[in-house]
Amino acid sequence: MKQVLIETIPFKVAPMQLTEGLKAPSGNPLVEGILATAEVKNGNGRYYPKDLWEREIDKYNQVVKENRATGELDHPDSTIISLKNVSHIIRECWWDGDKVMGKIEILPTTSGNILKALIENNVQVGVSSRGMGSLKEMNEGTLEVQDDFELLCWDFVSTPSNPGSYMQLVKEGKEIPTNSYVKVNSILTEILCANGTCPIF
């Protein structure tokens, strides 16, 4: 039976740099990195064959071309992308060996502004694929994703399941290391209270 399948990869921020990050033609910031890895058992015990990912990426690239490859911040267990929660749009997808790479534009929506602030302040989040499909046990502890799998989108979430992969802000210029730590609550407060009213108090 098909079910919602969610896979998450860590998302880490590059060190602060002297120049601003590269931006999309719209002026919005871009991030890039690994979206998924084929032919390996991930942190959820699932195995995605490469030919399965190749088929789905070919289909998804059409969605990218049509300017519809949006995703959410903190995705639901749903097959529907909620436009009111959209935070980003994927602009490019390509292969690097067994890794699916992507370039993502962060949108100036409520969720996108929160995501941008978190990334700029070195808060680690995860990039997570959302799809529908069924599973078959290969061996003890490993479930193979079956041919009925359908990729829906990629979302940004808080809990990583696939260690070792990350995305970073697309920047150029000399790097300046930083060890500053900013609490998530402080970032959210700054965003939500920017217009002079604070709905969280």
What role is predicted for each listed range?
Residues M1-V63, I176-V184, T197:
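Polar/acidic, low-complexity leader/linker segments enriched in S/T/G and N/D
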Residues N44-G45, S82, G112-K116:
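A short, polar/proline- and glycine-enriched secondary-structure boundary/capping micro-motif
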Residues V184-L192:
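Noncatalytic, helix-rich "gating/capping" subdomain that lines the substrate-entry/channel surface
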Residues Q3-L5, P10-K12, E72, H88-N185:
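Residue microenvironments linked to proteolytic maturation
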Residues N61-I80, V127:
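Short conserved beta-strand and strand-loop elements enriched in small hydrophobics
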Residues I191-F201:
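Short acidic DE-rich linear segments
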Residues V40, D77-T79, L107-T110:
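Short, charged/polar surface micro-motifs in flexible loops or helix N-caps
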Residues N85:
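Glycine-rich loop at the start of a catalytic domain that most often binds anionic cofactors/ligands
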